[in-house]
Swiss-Prot record:
Effect of W73A: Binding to CYFIP1 reduced by 70%. Does not affect mRNA nuclear export or nuclear pore complex reprogramming. Does not affect affinity for mRNA cap. Reduces interaction with LRPPRC. Reduces affinity for PML and viral Z protein
Native species: Mus musculus
Chain residue ranges for the region called EIF4EBP1/2/3 binding: 37-40, 73-77, 132-139
Modifications the protein undergoes after translation, according to the UniProt entry: Phosphorylation increases the ability of the protein to bind to mRNA caps and to form the eIF4F complex. Phosphorylation also enhances its mRNA transport function. Phosphorylation at Ser-209 is not essential for protein synthesis.
Its biological purpose: Acts in the cytoplasm to initiate and regulate protein synthesis and is required in the nucleus for export of a subset of mRNAs from the nucleus to the cytoplasm which promotes processes such as RNA capping, processing and splicing. Component of the protein complex eIF4F, which is involved in the recognition of the mRNA cap, ATP-dependent unwinding of 5'-terminal secondary structure and recruitment of mRNA to the ribosome.
Effect of S209D: Abolishes phosphorylation and abrogates the ability to transform cells
Binding site for mRNA: W56, Q57, W102, E103, R157, A158, K159, G160, D161, K162, T205, K206, S207
Lineage: Eukaryota, Metazoa, Chordata, Craniata, Vertebrata
Description of how the protein assembles with itself and partners: eIF4F is a multi-subunit complex, the composition of which varies with external and internal environmental conditions. It is composed of at least EIF4A, EIF4E and EIF4G1/EIF4G3. EIF4E is also known to interact with other partners. Interacts with EIF4ENIF1/4E-T; promotes recruitment to P-bodies and import into the nucleus.
Protein name as it appears in the record: Eukaryotic translation initiation factor 4E
Biased composition regions of type Low complexity, renumbered to the chain: 1-11
Residue numbers of Phosphoserine PTMs: S209
Gene: Eif4e
Length: 217
């Protein structure tokens, strides 16, 4: 004769387990909304407006400092694009503690990789090149030589705009040339385009309109 299996009484354990699972998932997911991604360095963004009635230093203004990826994008998306600035204005991004001037202790023995743009490039290349420059800096894109980087400057000028990465020691050939090669590659410049590195001392004492290049890539 067939036997009837005894009915099993349902356990009350599964629902709490489901609740725990849900709570656990929430605990894992939620912190992503609050955790910011730290940068290796703290950076300061400066703005320069050429008001001839004021001293050079009075025209230089600190906009903000940041040390996370999210705070960088919040700042970048809030300010005017370089291509919309009035001629005579600059943006500078430097490591916190370094001022965007040749006389700063970290800059005075250094120099810059200089990108010179023609008037037509303000519309086509300026903003793209400047953003890529910023990302190179905050992303520490120059490998072991990123410590040699002090900052970068974009000069908006009627005759043609300029972008430059500043390094701390112009005599450090290995660091300077590596930074130049990586920078040129990141900007997507073709091999036939040559960019030059000039020391700040040479730029400050130049007799003509151009400064001699210490290095080229």
């Amino acid at each position: 004769m067939a036997t009837v299996e005894p009915e099993t009484t349902p356990t009350t354990n599964p629902p709490p387990a489901e609740e725990e699972k849900t709570e656990s998932n929430q605990e894992v997911a939620n912190p992503e909304h609050y955790i910011k991604h730290p940068l290796q360095n703290r950076w300061a963004l400066w703005f320069f407006k050429n008001d001839k009635s004021k001293t050079w230093q009075a025209n230089l203004r600190l906009i903000s400092k940041f040390d996370t990826v999210e705070d960088f994008w919040a700042l970048y998306n809030h300010i005017q694009l370089s291509s919309n600035l009035m001629p005579g204005c600059d943006y500078s991004l430097f490591k916190d503690g370094i001022e965007p001037m040749w006389e700063d202790e970290k800059n005075k023995r250094g120099g810059r990789w200089l990108i010179t743009l023609n008037k037509q490039q303000r519309r086509s290349d300026l903003d793209r090149f400047w953003l890529e420059t910023l990302l190179c800096l905050i992303g520490e894109s120059f490998d072991d030589y990123s410590d040699d980087v002090c900052g970068a400057v974009v000069n908006v000028r009627a005759k043609g705009d300029k972008i430059a990465i500043w390094t701390t020691e112009c005599e450090n050939r290995d660091a300077v040339t590596h930074i130049g090669r990586v920078y040129k590659e990141r900007l997507g410049l073709p091999p036939k385009i040559v960019i030059g590195y000039q020391s700040h001392a040479d730029t400050a004492t130049k007799s003509g309109s151009t400064t001699k290049n210490r290095f080229v890539v």
